[in-house]
């Protein structure tokens, strides 16, 4: 953005990257035309962007049809012609008249904004307000919506009752960005979308103003790596009250001391403000580069003097790369240009104090500030040192000296890595901005006299570009100096302050800086979850950031994605559902995020038009589309266009299962998409998978996010965030005996309300009707059919293909409290943990809301997970409770050595009880169990019935797996478990459950669309509901439907051929056309899997159904099978359809986009050892990469957040 130049004391047209913001509406023209051409013409139907192809010097104009006349704008270098239609929106006349052009005036009097003597007419204010509100709602694509109409009515009512109105924060941000976008004199507007807006409208005193300004300077300077642009907006002008004003023209300026001989030491442009500072108590030095203090004025009060802390002002000594004597000149300049005396107008509201900053264009320092005769005027001194002949202008000594001074400026800013841009790069970026604006708005206001830099005029592309100058609103406007005329109200000279008073003011400001900054830096934490785990983590994150920010925690479906453009900090915690899809409450957010446009993805390639689900399932670092725009972003600079989310800082944590092919796909996609849209990532993506310590991963990621240098230093709250992270995530905070106590409760546990309380989801109760083993009695394994009676509850109304998450009470052969481990004695009275409130006195105990009142046995049975291996964090807590030193040392080692922990966990798969048996000296107090054990997580199963065939019932197909943890998790004979009903209890028992919709796994509504169903093992579960529904339609309604093909797979026809009789009966009654079964362990037969059946017997049908008949394919089963099928189908399509394999892969993408290739994948399988061994290998690989710094956080959670049959 650059030196947003104010001109109150600087006559002449200063140039550069500044918001010089003049409004001479008839600016200088470019080179003379070789032949007269009309400068005004009827506008074409659609504004045309500049054509950058070479053209003759005198192009032939094709006259558009008659219509409204707009200025024709020509580029004399390229010969391209456009029409500026945006100028029709200008509502203010310029200073020029038919007989005179005032375009070269620096400060046209007509365009200055002076304080009015009374409130503006209500109708005038309403007209401007309506126009702005319309602009805002059009920008967010909500024009004409109910919210738009309600906001207009709200503004009208406020103006009618108070004479003014107030902007919402999002409107203020939009208005400030538009004001910069509309500034005709600024050459750096291509970054207008990245303006960081600090809302200081709650400021009430000059002291608070100074604190906000210090924060602004600290943020914008950023240790030399200057922020793109920032503005702090103080309270608006209010009728009957004085204004907030900053008397200085810029926040950082050098003093100018008038000498007795009339000369000036320092910067002559600042003599007047220097004298005012001295009158208000400043004790000046006498140097050429003394930083001026600030004069700040609150309404109806005298201005107050504030000295900027020296460490806040970054200065750059100037030296030349080849001229060694240049450094001896003692020249220097400050790094941050920040204009502070201009007025911001938005929708008729005026903000007289709105300092804004950017970075310098080199010519602003090297040519204007140092070489102008009315400034430092060093040109001749440098020329003499260069031995140039200054006696004649034909020696070009001025040009030679000016170039070397500019070269010195650019060179000096490079070693300390202070942001600066040369005038060639700046003007090229402005041409790109003109092109962007012509496409987006039909034009761009520009003042040619200010856009063309002060040197290299015709060597820059802007010199050859005609421009149209006009005024749009919102806008930055000039205003009279506050000590002149009527603006000087309350500006009397205050007594001279002592040095001690000034020093105390600086000290107080420094102490308030972080506090006030934290109050105004908002953080938005978004979550999307199916089980509530991501929500729980988001709430923990909210508690962490509450001490340093102003956070709000929202579910994605409660958040308006439009607000992303105005956010400063967003943290996302989300799970991944199904096949890499967003959870249900993240669907709308995902779709809206994909619809937003970014600066690096404007290519019209067909990949851009794919649906968000395809992008989310394919987005990765290896995606060529992602790699392309990421490369462009790395090559971009401050002169390139900003994205829609240019001011956003973000960080993402994902939950999922590493057993799935699209592990954390939604989180990865959100992370990638936010960066693609221009956001700045504050930390690497954190990932938590099903089979590793999710809590540890999240804590590490949360601490990293809060302590991250970019996150904290950006918002000036580093120490507060670090302290908060230590307080929230410290193991010492997690458990202290004195912080917890148990109290007995009169009420007993009601299980259903208790589960709803714990899982924060609506749940329903059902009765177990029967539990039937579907496998042969000779089988060493078991699969059961569970029938549940729902009693017709509305919350359990389902469709075939949906999922349900039951909560059967877990059975264990070793219950706590029955000998063995040292666990606190079980009380059969309901207990409630209590803890002191934050900041409250120790006697003031409050209920811990984690669990409902229940006995310890009930908590361990229904709510807490005692079967998963304890996390390193829990082992660390156990080490503090071990009485035997050797056991304490071993537990500490396991908790701190990731590789030792993984070896121990994967070899033993120990439950909590087995850990206590291994370390018998650990004595567990009951409060620790109730407050520190992880919650028992539900698992989702595909519904195996159709409501039309079994009203009031839900059927589930469940594979029962028993594990011997002392023998590397090998399956054991589960017959005893099945005979006793397994974990489901006996007939008539109660179970609680949650219904989850699966709208993407449903039979097509057209009964004549052909389908292929692929489901080995328990993957047949949802298909049972499909054939029951089809059978009911055939027999009860007489509907004839296309008969799908079923491909089933099992080990042996005599042992585990699930539902064989039902399938055969359904085929005989016309439900299935073909049924094929793959046997992987059939005696005297080769191993055959479902993908082999597809390849050898159904290849032609697969191609015909998917490519020719627009049919559907459904795949349900474990992740290994689903991956194999997904690899097989493209090969079939390539072979049968005569296409390349890449093309066939694209076809699968299209099928998914059209929801014709459906997957229902689950992670836990009967091949437990195979899958877990593979994931274990991945885990160790990730650990090694983490130790090398390649993967910051990649941990797996102990509980699933994805569904499965």
From Swiss-Prot:
Swiss-Prot/TrEMBL keywords: Calcium, Calmodulin-binding, Cell membrane, Cytoplasm, Cytoskeleton, FAD, Flavoprotein, FMN, Golgi apparatus, Heme, Iron, Membrane, Metal-binding, NADP, Oxidoreductase, Phosphoprotein, Zinc
Annotated (6R)-L-erythro-5,6,7,8-tetrahydrobiopterin binding sites: 104, 368, 449-450, 463
Binding site for heme b: 186, 478
Binding-site residues for Zn(2+), renumbered to this chain: 96, 101
Residues binding FAD: 803, 939, 941-942, 957, 959
Cofactor(s) this protein cannot do without: heme b; FAD; FMN; (6R)-L-erythro-5,6,7,8-tetrahydrobiopterin
Catalytic activity: 2 L-arginine + 3 NADPH + 4 O2 + H(+) = 2 L-citrulline + 2 nitric oxide + 3 NADP(+) + 4 H2O
UniProt activity-regulation remark: Stimulated by calcium/calmodulin. Inhibited by NOSIP and NOSTRIN.
UniProt KW Calcium keyword: yes
Binding site for FMN: 529-531, 533, 575-576, 657, 664, 690, 694
CDD domains, alphabetized: NOS_oxygenase_euk
Sites of Phosphothreonine modification: 498, 1177
Subunit structure: Homodimer. Interacts with NOSIP and NOSTRIN. Interacts with HSP90AB1. Forms a complex with ASL, ASS1 and SLC7A1; the complex regulates cell-autonomous L-arginine synthesis and citrulline recycling while channeling extracellular L-arginine to nitric oxide synthesis pathway.
The family this protein is said to belong to: Belongs to the NOS family.
Role: Produces nitric oxide (NO) which is implicated in vascular smooth muscle relaxation through a cGMP-mediated signal transduction pathway. NO mediates vascular endothelial growth factor (VEGF)-induced angiogenesis in coronary vessels and promotes blood clotting through the activation of platelets.
Protein name stated in the entry: Nitric oxide synthase 3
């Amino acid at each position: 953005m650059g030196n947003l130049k104010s001109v109150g004391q600087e006559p002449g047209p200063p140039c550069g990257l500044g918001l010089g913001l003049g409004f001479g509406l008839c600016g200088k023209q470019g080179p003379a035309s070789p032949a007269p051409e009309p400068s005004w013409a009827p506008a074409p139907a659609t504004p045309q962007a500049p054509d950058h192809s070479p053209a003759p010097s005198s192009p032939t104009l094709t006259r558009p049809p008659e219509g409204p006349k707009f200025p024709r704008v020509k580029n004399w270098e390229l010969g391209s012609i456009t029409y500026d239609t945006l100028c029709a929106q200008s509502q203010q006349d310029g200073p020029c008249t038919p007989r005179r052009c005032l375009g070269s005036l620096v400060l046209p009097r007509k365009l200055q904004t002076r304080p009015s003597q009374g409130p503006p007419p209500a109708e005038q204010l309403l007209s401007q307000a309506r126009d702005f509100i319309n602009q805002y709602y059009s920008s967010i694509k909500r024009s004409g919506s109910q919210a738009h109409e309600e906001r207009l009515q709200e503004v009208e009512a406020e103006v009618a009752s108070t004479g003014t109105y107030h902007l919402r924060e999002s409107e203020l941000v939009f208005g400030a960005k538009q004001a910069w976008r509309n500034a005709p004199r600024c050459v750096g507007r291509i970054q207008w979308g990245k303006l960081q807006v600090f809302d200081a409208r709650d400021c009430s005193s000059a002291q608070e103003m100074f604190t906000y300004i210090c924060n602004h300077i600290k943020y914008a300077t950023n240790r030399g790596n200057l922020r793109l642009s920032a503005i702090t907006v103080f309270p608006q002008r209010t009728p009957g009250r004085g204004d907030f004003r900053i008397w200085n023209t810029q926040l950082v300026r050098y003093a100018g001391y008038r000498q007795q001989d009339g000369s000036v030491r320092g910067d002559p442009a600042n003599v007047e403000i220097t004298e005012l500072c001295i009158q208000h108590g400043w004790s000046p030095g006498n140097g050429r580069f003394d930083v001026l203090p600030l004069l700040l004025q609150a309404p109806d009060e005298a201005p107050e003097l504030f000295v900027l802390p020296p460490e806040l002002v970054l200065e750059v000594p100037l030296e030349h790369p080849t001229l060694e004597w240049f450094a001896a000149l003692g020249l220097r300049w400050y790094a941050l240009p920040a204009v502070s005396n201009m007025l911001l107008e938005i929708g008729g509201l005026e903000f007289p104090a709105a300092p804004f900053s950017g970075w310098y264009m080199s010519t602003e320092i090297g040519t204007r500030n140092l070489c102008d005769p009315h400034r430092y005027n060093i040109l001749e001194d440098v020329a003499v040192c260069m031995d140039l002949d200054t006696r004649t202008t034909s020696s070009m000594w001025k040009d030679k000296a000016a170039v070397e001074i500019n070269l010195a400026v650019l060179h000096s800013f490079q070693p300390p890595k202070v942001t600066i841009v040369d005038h060639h790069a700046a003007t090229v970026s402005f041409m790109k901005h003109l092109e962007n604006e012509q496409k987006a708005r039909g034009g761009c206001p520009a003042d040619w006299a200010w856009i063309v830099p002060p040197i290299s005029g015709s060597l820059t592309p802007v010199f050859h570009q005609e421009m149209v100058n006009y005024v749009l609103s919102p806008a930055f406007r000039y205003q009279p100096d506050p000590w002149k005329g009527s603006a000087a109200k309350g500006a009397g000279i205050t007594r001279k302050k002592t040095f001690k008073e000034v020093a105390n003011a600086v000290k107080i400001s420094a102490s308030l800086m972080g506090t006030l900054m934290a109050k105004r830096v908002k953080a938005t934490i978004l979550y999307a979850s199916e089980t509530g785990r991501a929500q729980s983590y988001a709430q923990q994150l909210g508690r962490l950031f509450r001490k340093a920010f102003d956070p709000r925690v929202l579910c994605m479906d409660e958040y308006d994605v439009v607000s992303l453009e105005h956010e400063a900090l967003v943290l996302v915690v989300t799970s991944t559902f199904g096949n890499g899809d967003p959870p249900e409450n993240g669907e709308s957010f995902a779709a809206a995020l994909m619809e937003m446009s970014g600066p690096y993805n404007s290519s019209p390639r067909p990949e851009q038009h794919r649906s968000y689900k395809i992008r989310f399932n394919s987005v990765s670092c290896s995606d060529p589309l992602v790699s392309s725009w990421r490369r462009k972003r790395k090559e971009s600079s401050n002169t390139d266009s900003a994205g829609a989310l240019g001011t956003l800082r973000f960080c993402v944590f994902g939950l999922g299962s590493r057993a799935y092919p699209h592990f954390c796909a939604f989180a990865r996609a959100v992370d990638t998409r936010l960066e693609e849209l221009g956001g700045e990532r504050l930390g690497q993506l954190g990932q938590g998978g099903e089979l590793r310590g999710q809590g540890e991963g999240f804590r590490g990621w949360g601490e990293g996010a809060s302590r991250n240098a970019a996150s904290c230093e950006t918002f000036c709250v580093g120490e507060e965030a670090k302290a908060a992270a230590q307080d929230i995530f410290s193991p010492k905070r997690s458990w202290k005996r004195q912080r917890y106590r148990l109290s007995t409760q009169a009420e007993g546990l009601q299980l259903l309300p208790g589960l709803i309380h714990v899982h924060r989801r609506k749940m329903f109760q059902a009765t177990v009707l029967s539990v039937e083993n579907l496998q042969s009695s000779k089988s060493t394994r078991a699969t059961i059919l569970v029938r549940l009676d729902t009693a017709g509850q509305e919350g359990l109304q389902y469709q075939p293909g949906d999922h349900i998450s039951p909560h059967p009470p877990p059975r264990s052969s070793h219950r706590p409290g029955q000998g063995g481990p040292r666990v606190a004695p079980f009380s059969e009275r309901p207990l409630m943990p209590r803890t002191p409130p934050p900041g409250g006195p120790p006697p003031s105990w409050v209920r811990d809301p984690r669990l409902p009142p229940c006995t310890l046995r009930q908590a361990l049975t229904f709510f807490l997970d005692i079967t998963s291996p304890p996390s390193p964090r829990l082992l660390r807590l156990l080490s503090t409770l071990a009485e035997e030193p050797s056991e304490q040392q071993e537990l500490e080692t396991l908790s701190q050595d990731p590789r030792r922990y993984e070896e121990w966990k994967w070899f033993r798969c120990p439950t909590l009880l087995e850990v206590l048996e291994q370390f018998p000296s650990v004595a567990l107090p009951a409060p620790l169990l109730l407050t520190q054990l992880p919650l028992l997580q539900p698992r989702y199963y595909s519904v195996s019935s159709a409501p039309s065939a079994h009203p009031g019932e839900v059927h589930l197909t469940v594979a029962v797996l028993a594990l011997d943890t002392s023998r590397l998790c090998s399956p054991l004979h589960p017959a005893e478990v099945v005979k006793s009903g397994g974990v489901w209890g006996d007939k008539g028992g109660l179970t609680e459950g949650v219904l989850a919709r699966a709208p993407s796994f449903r039979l097509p509504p057209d009964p004549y669309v052909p389908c292929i169903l692929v489901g080995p093992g328990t993957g047949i579960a949802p298909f049972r509901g499909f054939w029951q529904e089809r059978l009911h339609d055939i027999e009860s309604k007489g509907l004839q439907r296309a008969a799908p093909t079923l491909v089933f797979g099992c080990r042996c026809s005599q042992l585990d051929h699930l539902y064989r009789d039902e399938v055969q009966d359904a085929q005989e009654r016309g439900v299935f056309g073909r049924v094929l079964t793959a046997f992987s362990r059939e005696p005297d037969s080769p191993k055959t899997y479902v993908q082999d059946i597809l390849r050898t017997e159904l290849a032609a049908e697969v191609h015909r159904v998917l490519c020719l008949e627009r049919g559907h394919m459904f795949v349900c089963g474990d992740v290994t099978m689903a991956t194999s099928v997904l690899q097989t189908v493209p090969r079939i399509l390539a072979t049968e359809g005569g296409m390349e394999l890449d093309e066939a892969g694209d076809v699968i993408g299209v099928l998914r986009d059209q929801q014709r290739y459906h997957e229902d994948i689950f992670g836990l399988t009967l091949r437990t050892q195979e899958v877990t061994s593979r994931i274990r290998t991945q885990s160790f690989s990730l650990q090694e990469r983490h130790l090398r710094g390649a993967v910051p956080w990649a941990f797996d959670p102990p509980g699933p957040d994805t569904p499965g049959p």
